[in-house]
Amino acid sequence: VFTIIVPTHNRPTLLSRTLKSLIAQSYSNFHVIVVDDAAAYIPPYEDLSALKGRYTYIVRSGVSGPAESRNMAMKLTNSRYVMFLDDDDTLEPGHLQSLAMSLESNSPALLFCDFKVQYEDRTVEPPQHLSSDTVSIADATKDSVFVRNRIPNSCLLYRADVLSDMSYDTEMDIYEDWDFLLACLKLNDLVHLPINSVNIHKSQANAPENMRRGNTRDDLIAQAMLMLYKRHPALNEEARQARQSLMAGAGIASPLTDC
């Protein structure tokens, strides 16, 4: 029923934690595709063997980054639904079971759920848990995602046919997941599932992985958002005005025609 795509880059401890959360799932009809773009360590054979054949592990060359890894994995999927799980996030044991039960009565094109944020200190090994927050994004809509995306990639489930001819932009430094979601939403709608069994693990803002991806660079964020606004026009006047207002709040004057 599910293919779970996990791109990874030189984070063996975090990847092992993610895989262990999949091993612990009460629902077993899924396949995991791990794509490693660094080949800097021995694959986690113990974790993979516990998946009992329900995995594909790929070591790829070329430019590092999750976009190309996800694109490669998408070509190998043959399930009803596809999930993109970051290599530092985890699923609680009943997550896939809850998803499967919700799909018994309907087959939404895109499904999303709430989540928990697990703050942690990654300067120690293994990471030390600091605090938790529960986050509801039940009010997220298709229109709101065209203004600002609050849905973590790991909280989304895509019906396989939605992904036909879709690919992640490998040239983007940040927000390639938002770009991908917007492309999928042009012809499809979002459905919310009120569960919060996805754990989004976060390190300090100045952690190396955040600096590498540009997530702390306000100038990159604004530039990327404006590019996405041009690439994916708002669906209605209200969304265009909301985009303009959001940019104005950041001190950026953007003509309505660019929103």
Please place each PLM-identified region on the residue numbering.
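Cell-envelope/extracellular polymer assembly enzymes that use nucleotide-activated donors
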Residues: 1-3, 21, 31, 179
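Conserved donor NDP-sugar-binding/catalytic core segment of glycosyltransferases
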Residues: 94-127
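Conserved nucleotide-sugar donor-binding catalytic segment
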Residues: 135-222
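Acidic donor-binding segment of Leloir-type glycosyltransferases
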Residues: 19-59
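Short aromatic/hydrophobic "clamp" motif used to bind/position activated sugar donors
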Residues: 82
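The conserved acidic donor/metal-binding loop of glycosyltransferases
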Residues: 86-90, 114
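Glycine-rich, basic loop-to-helix element that forms the pyrophosphate-binding segment
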Residues: 60-77
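A conserved hydrophobic helix/loop-capping motif in glycosyltransferases and polysaccharide synthases
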Residues: 2-14, 18, 25, 35
